[in-house]
Amino acid sequence: MLLARIKQLREELNIQQRQMADAIGVDAPMYSRIERGIRPFRDEYIAPMAKILKIDKDELRSLWTADKIINVTKDESDSVAQRALHLAKSE
């Protein structure tokens, strides 16, 4: 979700990967690996990416959080995952 959205926005705005890399303080090959999901996405990338992509930080953070939830619950049945989300919401 997150990485696909970042790539979509980057391409729509004609932003090169090297520009994104500069914004988050990594080299272009590392940025490419991040965008492809080979290297982990870090919290510290959210603010500079949001700025260059002209998007709200909360949208990126929400997508990142959704990806983490999906990753944690991907091996669980839908009912177990839904119950876990319900329990987490009630806390």
For each feature predicted by the language model, list its residue ranges.
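A short, Lys/Arg-rich alpha-helix, primarily the initiator
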Residues: 1-12
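Alpha-helical residues within the helix-turn-helix
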Residues: 11, 22, 51
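Short alpha-helical DNA-recognition segment
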Residues: 14-33
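DNA major-groove recognition helix of helix-turn-helix/homeodomain DNA-binding modules
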Residues: 25, 42-62
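Short, charged recognition helix plus adjacent turn
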Residues: 61-91
